[in-house]
């Protein structure tokens, strides 16, 4: 890939629709040889959702259903949301990269291709709060080099939107000892949502 879009300006009050953003993303992604034949899983939820959750990339259960955050990772995410009084349908769910990939496959070129679309997606949804699930989503939106272990639990600002970095539910399935930290982060999200309603 030759194109680098990471720092393209995104109008803060864009009137783009999610449909327009997704159409452009799919047209451009399908034209790239390294992405041909991929199954793309786009964001799910409504414009105006108060909470947006951003993961790294879809997993195999997502491809089967065509929806983000399915299977064991999605089940755990739904339990986390229920614990703070939300349902999946209350939120907007998306990933930085829109196709199933391995961690090794996520080069800077791939991330630079997808990040501006994620930024435009967040602008179109207009959530009150964004929760980034893991290193790559946090770096994509905040352009930070710090690991998630140093970023989590501290409110960040993303273009005037409160952003809470935390661990990805997929990581919690591998290391359940981090659940307490995610619970502390999500209580802060719950309190901020309550205060803004």
Language-model-derived ranges and their functions:
Residues 1-197:
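A polyanion-binding, active-site-adjacent surface
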């Amino acid at each position: 890939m030759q194109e680098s879009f990471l720092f393209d300006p995104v109008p803060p009050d864009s009137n783009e629709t999610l449909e327009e953003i997704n159409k452009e993303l799919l047209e451009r992604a399908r034209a790239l040889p390294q992405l041909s034949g991929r199954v793309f899983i786009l964001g799910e939820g409504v414009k105006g959702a108060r909470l947006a959750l951003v993961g790294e990339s879809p997993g195999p259960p997502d491809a089967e259903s065509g929806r983000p955050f399915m299977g064991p990772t999605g089940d755990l995410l739904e339990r986390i949301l229920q614990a703070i009084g939300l349902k999946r349908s209350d939120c907007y769910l998306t990933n930085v990269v829109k196709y199933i990939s391995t961690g090794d496959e996520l080069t800077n070129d791939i991330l630079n291709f997808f990040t501006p679309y994620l930024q435009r997606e967040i602008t179109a949804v207009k959530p009150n709060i964004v929760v980034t699930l893991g290193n790559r989503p946090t770096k994509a939106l905040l352009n930070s080099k710090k690991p998630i272990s140093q970023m989590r639990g501290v409110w960040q600002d993303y273009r005037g939107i409160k952003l809470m970095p935390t661990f990805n539910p997929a990581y919690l399935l591998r290391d359940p000892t981090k659940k307490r930290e995610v619970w502390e982060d999500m209580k802060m999200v719950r309190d901020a949502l309550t205060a803004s309603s």
